[in-house]
Design a protein with these regions (language model features):
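Intrinsically disordered, low-structural-confidence terminal and linker regions
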Residues: 1-36
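Conserved N-proximal alpha/beta basic substrate-recognition cap immediately N-terminal to
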Residues: 24-156, 169-170, 322
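Active-site nucleotide/adenylate-binding loops and adjacent lid/helix of ATP-dependent enzymes
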Residues: 111-236
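Short, flexible loop/turn elements at secondary-structure junctions
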Residues: 132, 166-168, 182, 217-219, ...
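Protein kinase-like catalytic core scaffold
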Residues: 162, 248, 347-349
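Glycine-rich phosphate/pyrophosphate-binding beta-alpha loops
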Residues: 172, 235, 255-261, 352-364
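A long amphipathic alpha-helix within ATP-dependent nucleotide-binding catalytic cores
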Residues: 203-231, 240-243, 249-251, 255-342
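C-terminal active-site "lid" helix and adjoining low-complexity regulatory extension at the edge
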Residues: 294-323, 327-332, 341-398
Length: 398
């Protein structure tokens, strides 16, 4: 008598404990042209012409840029010359040309290096509590080399609350805010609610972030900011330019977290983006979403606080810190600083060597390709050629 085959029970894959990738939305042109035409009392052909004029214009806007930035909506852009709006690809081309000292990219892209470098100059950063670094062969007080080291660290009450993120990540992917360990259930409690399994979290770090994962103290927001959006840090994206050694603030916007989001990145559904007055830090308007989902907001959806009359706390101090940080990083003439207001003063969370113009263009309803900025770009291209000439001359002398 043959034994019946044992049925195979397939276990569905477990969702990651952290967001390891963001979803990308590609828009089908024909349906989108028809939708835009119907909503704006025009024809699909006219929408095609409008898009083509921007696609072949100075900003080289892609179709996804056209929809995501809502460039079909003249009301959103409030009379702005849309030919000054830079598309995502041209955005990257411009920043790479401006920040021509590519030998400095490593300092900026590695969060350990950037935090250490800025703090050495006395700038306010968030210290590193521990670092998962499996490639190391020698232990230290900060470096966690093995899974068991990481497990023991995460079970320590004295290191919490914690914020974790990849050492070389971007857009807050892989980040998490943890309130405390729960040893009785082998879990970790998240700030903002919910729990995750410790072993599942370790699995995700091992699988996705073998290059390094760091932990920092969780920084609470300034009380005025907390009253607006709760126990999470909403950072200002401040873009600085440095020309002839002199820094200036180019653009600024306030990223406001909402819903279940602990991270303030605007791509996360529900988060808000505020246009602010650079002189005063006062909110001028707030938008959520992008493309067809974009909508203006007058109150925070969680707290109900009205945005009218609200200013970014510690704005004057933030500007001072941003300009000083730009002086320190003068080798990179354009940096997007993420800075948050806390009860202890403004703190630099990250610096971005290829800042995404989407945030500031969409918040301000104003393109970046204006005459003053293009003059700056031209000056940096000349500086890049001079730098290359000097390097070749130095090599020739060897």
């Amino acid at each position: 008598m043959q034994n019946s085959p044992v049925p195979v029970i397939e276990t569905p894959p477990q969702a990651p404990t952290v967001t390891v990738a963001r979803a990308h939305q590609d828009f089908g042109p024909l349906a989108v042209f028809q939708r835009i035409a119907a909503a704006h009392d025009t024809t699909p052909l006219q929408v095609v012409r409008d898009y083509a004029s921007l696609a072949f214009g100075p900003g080289r806007v892609s179709f996804n840029d056209y929809v995501r930035l809502r460039l079909f909506d003249r009301l959103h852009w409030n009379g702005c010359d849309l030919r000054t709006v830079a598309g995502q690809r041209h955005n990257r081309e411009l920043v790479v040309a401006i920040n021509y000292r590519h030998d400095w990219y490593g300092v900026v892209t590695d969060k350990i290096a950037s935090t250490s470098y800025l703090s050495a100059f006395g700038l306010p950063t968030i210290p590193v509590t521990a670092l998962y670094a499996p490639r190391l062969t020698r232990a230290s007080s900060l470096a966690l080399r093995a899974r068991d080291d990481l497990r023991k660290f995460l079970m320590r009450d004295d290191v919490y609350p914690l914020f974790g993120k990849p050492a070389e990540g971007f857009q807050s992917l892989g980040s998490i805010a943890l309130r405390r360990p729960l040893p009785e259930s082998d879990e970790l409690e998240k700030i903002g609610g919910g729990r995750i399994g410790l072993e599942a979290f370790l699995d995700d770090i091992m699988q996705h972030y073998a290059g390094g994962y760091l932990f920092q103290p969780f920084v609470a927001p300034h009380p005025q900011a907390a009253a607006l959006f709760g126990e999470r840090l909403g950072t200002a994206r401040i873009i600085t330019l440095v020309e002839d050694g002199v820094p200036r603030i180019f653009r600024a916007a306030w990223k406001i977290p909402s819903g279940e989001n602990l991270a303030d990145n605007y791509w996360r559904s529900g988060n808000l983006l505020a246009k602010i007055d650079i002189d005063t830090g006062e909110i001028e308007r707030v938008v959520s979403g992008a493309g067809f989902e974009a909508a203006f907001k007058t109150h925070h959806p969680d707290t109900g606080v009205c945005f009218a009359g609200v200013a970014l706390p510690q704005w004057e101090e933030m500007k001072v810190v941003a300009l000083e940080a730009a002086r320190v990083m003068h080798h990179m003439p354009m940096i997007g600083w993420d800075m948050g207001p806390t009860s202890a003063g403004p703190v630099i969370v990250e610096m971005n060597e290829t800042p995404d113009f989407f945030l500031n263009q969409f918040a301000d309803a104003r393109g970046v390709l204006e005459p003053d900025f293009m003059r700056f770009v031209a000056a940096q291209k000349r500086a890049a050629k001079d730098h290359e000439t000097r390097m070749k001359s130095d090599i020739a002398k060897l």
